Amino acid sequence: MAKSTTFFISLTLPFLLLSVVTATYYQSMSPTVLGFQEEKFTHLHFYFHDVVTGPKPSMVIVAEPNGKAKNSLPFGTVVAMDDPLTVGPESDSKLVGKAQGIYTSISQEEMGLMMVMTMAFSDGEFNGSTLSILARNMIMSEPVREMAIVGGTGAFRFARGYAQAKFYSVDFTKGDAIVEYDIFVFHY
């Protein structure tokens, strides 16, 4: 009997100690403890200007594959961007922020991108706030592309939602594009 009790204690004691140690690094809490009130739902609408041409391009290719290319963004191309976000499609329209990040050409068969970008807002109610997108963007095969909003900062803390993107205008020869964005996001 003593041997089985000793065995049982030696088997359960590490689990008990582990559960005590594990429980010390987190706690469940209500969002109101951090000052978060009722969750909000926001719709944003703006235009994204991806400009290759001119004296001050907003995107640059930082890596590209060797060999012949079938299109302007062959598989494996990596692009860095600092694209203006504006109220209207015109380049001189009111600036509301920047889309900053990278995208990579991810498909050998069709024009597809992996977008890793932060939309940093610089005007109005959301000045200083950001939304982060991490998503596949099949720019040629889907007229309206849907991308995941995976987080945010400032007014968009705990953000989750999706972005819909569609070409407003695109010049495939030069590489310049204006993309219309509709963003639907839950946040506190």
UniProtKB/Swiss-Prot annotation:
EC number: 4.2.1.139
Biological process annotations from GO: defense response; phenylpropanoid biosynthetic process
Catalytic activity: a (4R)-4,2'-dihydroxyisoflavan = a pterocarpan + H2O; (3R,4R)-7,2'-dihydroxy-4'-methoxyisoflavanol = (-)-medicarpin + H2O; (3S,4R)-7,2'-dihydroxy-4'-methoxyisoflavanol = (+)-medicarpin + H2O; (3R,4R)-3-(6-hydroxy-1,3-benzodioxol-5-yl)-3,4-dihydro-2H-chromene-4,7-diol = (-)-maackiain + H2O
GO molecular function: pterocarpan synthase activity
InterPro entries per UniProt: Allene_oxi_cyc_Dirigent, Dirigent
Chief place of localization: secreted
Compartment(s) of residence: Secreted, Extracellular space, Apoplast
Top-level class of the enzyme under EC nomenclature: lyase
Record has Translocase as a keyword: no
Stretch forming the signal peptide: 1-23
Glycan attachment sites: N127
Summary of pH dependence: Optimum pH is 6.5-7.5.
The entry's keywords: Apoplast, Glycoprotein, Lyase, Plant defense, Secreted, Signal
Cellular component terms per the entry's GO annotation: apoplast
Subunit structure: Homodimer.
Its job: Involved in pterocarpan phytoalexin biosynthesis. Catalyzes the last step in the biosynthesis of the phytoalexin medicarpin, and thereby contributes to plant defense reactions. Dirigent proteins impart stereoselectivity on the phenoxy radical-coupling reaction, yielding optically active lignans from two molecules of coniferyl alcohol in the biosynthesis of lignans, flavonolignans, and alkaloids and thus plays a central role in plant secondary metabolism.
Record-stated family: Belongs to the plant dirigent protein family.
Name of this chain's protein: Pterocarpan synthase 1
Gene for this chain: PTS1
